[in-house]
């Protein structure tokens, strides 16, 4: 059975709680990604995630300065999965929470991120990823303040 650690992106950009929204935006631009995990000061423990949408809605659109703390814009306690999670478990979480990406951890330490794109590239999971995308795209059931 394929585990998420076999499909995730392990070499990823991340922010720490000491970063500001400008630094997050630059890292996202440089990596060409729409979201970036946020780790604690230890540089390992996942504490949040920030998306390009978060930066707009919680920063730019309300005229916050670029020096705004990343912790003011991020989603705290994001949905995440352990490395040994199954593809079905991740697809279920993506569909039920309307997420296109989920941080991957091992004992709460960030080890990677898995995206719907990662799952669609695998022959074993392509069809199921398409089904999850359909579920994600059907309406927007996100809670206010839950933007990734």
UniProtKB/Swiss-Prot annotation:
PROSITE patterns: CBS. Disulfide bonds: none annotated. Gene3D superfamilies: CBS-domain. It comes from the Bacteria. Residues 139-148 have a biased composition (Basic and acidic residues). Residues 127-148 are annotated as: Disordered. The keyword Transcription does not apply. Keywords: CBS domain, Repeat. InterPro entries: CBS_dom, CBS_dom_sf, Diverse_CBS-Domain. CDD domains: CBS_pair_HRP1_like (cd04622). Residues 8-68, 74-130 form the CBS domain. This is Uncharacterized protein YlbB. It comes from Bacillus subtilis (strain 168). The lineage of its organism: Bacteria, Bacillati, Bacillota, Bacilli, Bacillales. The gene is ylbB.
């Amino acid at each position: 059975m394929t585990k998420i650690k076999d499909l995730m992106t392990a070499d990823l950009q991340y922010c720490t709680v000491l970063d500001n929204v400008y630094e997050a935006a630059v890292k996202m631009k440089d990596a060409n990604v729409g979201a970036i995990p946020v780790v604690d000061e230890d540089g390992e423990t996942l504490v949040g995630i920030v998306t390009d949408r978060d930066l707009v809605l919680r920063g730019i659109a309300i005229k916050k300065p670029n020096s705004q703390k990343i912790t003011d814009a991020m989603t705290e306690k994001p949905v995440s999965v352990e490395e040994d999670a199954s593809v079905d478990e991740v697809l279920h979480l993506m569909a039920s929470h309307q997420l296109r990406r989920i941080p991957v951890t091992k004992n709460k330490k960030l080890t990677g991120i898995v995206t719907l794109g990662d799952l669609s590239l695998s022959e074993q999971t392509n069809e199921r990823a398409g089904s999850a995308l359909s579920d994600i795209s059907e309406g927007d059931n996100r809670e206010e303040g839950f933007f990734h």
